[in-house]
Amino acid sequence: MQPRVILTDIEGTTSSISFVKNVLFPYARKALPAFVAEHGQQPEVRRWLDAVATEIGGACQDSLVAETLQGWIDQDRKHTALKALQGLIWDEGYRRGDYTAHFYPEVAPVLKGWHAAGLPLYVYSSGSVPAQKLFFGFSDAGDLSPLVSGWFDTEIGGKREADSYRRIVQAIGVPAGEIVFLSDVVEELDAAREAGLQTRLIDRLDDYPMPRIGQAANGHERVENFQQIQL
């Protein structure tokens, strides 16, 4: 069945893992203490600081929360509060021009081609929806956000859980079998397949020097870049 809708991951799929790990994460880690001190009383920030404080044992100083968040960055923890606060920090960095978001060079032309062909594109990433919009809006290929019909993050559920994809299918409103999910993570693709979606394993040599073929692909169609995706 030919897909009618595309659902894509970002890190390791449209964009280099190294950009996130070597640029965005260190930027947020360094900025966290000052950001929390300056913006900690703003409702959109306070909400997440209080959530972290509750998780680590109740009332505690914001400086301790900031240290905890820095530790979570070091652990690459996929925590919704951390992702939300990182997104707010990255917003400042993007708008100041401190960096632009990396996209592999073939991605933007392919996305534009799908858009012109009438194929809706949705994004599902562990990064918060505001961070996703910044990533596409301030990319090194220009503003790609008009190509995206909708955004999903871990507030809808974890990316390795089939129910998350079932909820996304309901939100998009087309049969699961008509949606193709693009990701570099086999376990995410497994969950999407369990929910009835089509899948493609994005296996970029820059991010995965050892090609994942045979058993390593676990039955998912493997491509090395977006130009190889046949829809």
UniProtKB/Swiss-Prot annotation:
The annotated pathway is:
Amino-acid biosynthesis; L-methionine biosynthesis via salvage pathway; L-methionine from S-methyl-5-thio-alpha-D-ribose 1-phosphate: step 3/6; Amino-acid biosynthesis; L-methionine biosynthesis via salvage pathway; L-methionine from S-methyl-5-thio-alpha-D-ribose 1-phosphate: step 4/6
Catalytic activity annotation: 5-methylsulfanyl-2,3-dioxopentyl phosphate + H2O = 1,2-dihydroxy-5-(methylsulfanyl)pent-1-en-3-one + phosphate
Look up keyword Transport and say if it applies. Answer: no
Q: Which cysteines are joined by disulfide bonds?
A: none
Q: What are the record keywords, sorted? A: Amino-acid biosynthesis, Hydrolase, Magnesium, Metal-binding, Methionine biosynthesis
Q: What class of enzyme is it?
A: hydrolase
Q: Does the keyword Amino-acid biosynthesis apply?
A: yes
Q: Which Pfam families match?
A: Hydrolase
Q: What is its EC number?
A: 3.1.3.77
- Look up the record and give one Gene Ontology term from the biological process aspect: L-methionine salvage from methylthioadenosine
**UniProt-recorded Gene Ontology molecular function terms:** 2,3-diketo-5-methylthiopentyl-1-phosphate enolase activity; 2-hydroxy-3-keto-5-methylthiopentenyl-1-phosphate phosphatase activity; acireductone synthase activity; magnesium ion binding
Span of the signal peptide: none
Return the cofactor note field. Answer: Binds 1 Mg(2+) ion per subunit.
* The organism's place on the tree of life at top rank: Bacteria
Name the cofactor(s) required for activity, per the record.
Mg(2+)
Q: What does this protein do?
A: Bifunctional enzyme that catalyzes the enolization of 2,3-diketo-5-methylthiopentyl-1-phosphate (DK-MTP-1-P) into the intermediate 2-hydroxy-3-keto-5-methylthiopentenyl-1-phosphate (HK-MTPenyl-1-P), which is then dephosphorylated to form the acireductone 1,2-dihydroxy-3-keto-5-methylthiopentene (DHK-MTPene).
Q: Spell out the family assignment given in the record's similarity comment.
A: Belongs to the HAD-like hydrolase superfamily. MasA/MtnC family.
NCBIfam families (alphabetical): enolase-ppase, HAD-SF-IA-v1
**Which protein is depicted?**
Enolase-phosphatase E1
